[in-house]
Amino acid sequence: MTIEVDVETTIGRPPDEVFAALVDVERYPAWLIASGIVRVEAVDPGPLRAGSGLRIHQTVAGRSTVLDGQVTVLEPGAAFGLRGKDREGVSVRIDAVIALDDMATRLRWSLRIGLPLRYRMFESMVAPQARRAAALDLEAFKRRLESARG
């Protein structure tokens, strides 16, 4: 079973700035707070590209895990995606799509969480928490970017 979360927001910054912040994965812990992201490491040297490896450290509801991840999409100024899976089979997929919206940027954040059979009994508890966390994290991302006006 897959938990699906889709959140959209408008950010008062140009698309290139929003995209730059989305691909700055090592800063994810600064705004993916509700999702419990504590560290993200690029595994491969050099700039991120589709296929780049990531190691994502997360603590949620007292459960710490490391997801082995990969950048799935990297289209400058338009889309960024990643996926990861932990040792117990929990998988996560994030797809972010941005578009110019008047003088701002429209961001669509899609999250998919796949739970292995042994965790499916918790799905009804995890789904609303995941929705709330995504909304809070996207709001933190928006505030962070909009407060950086210079």
What name fits each language-model region?
Residues 1-43:
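Hydrophobic ligand-binding cavity/cleft-lining segments
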Residues 39-87, 101, 106, 139-150:
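Glycine-rich portal/gate segments that line the openings of hydrophobic small-molecule binding cavities
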Residues 83-136:
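Beta-strand/loop substructures that line and gate deep hydrophobic ligand-binding cavities in soluble
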Residues 13, 23, 49, 66, ...:
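Generic recognition of short, well-ordered alpha-helical interface segments
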Residues 8-12, 70, 97:
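Generic structural detector for well-ordered beta-strands
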Residues 4-6, 64-68, 90-95:
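Short, surface-exposed coil-to-beta transition loops
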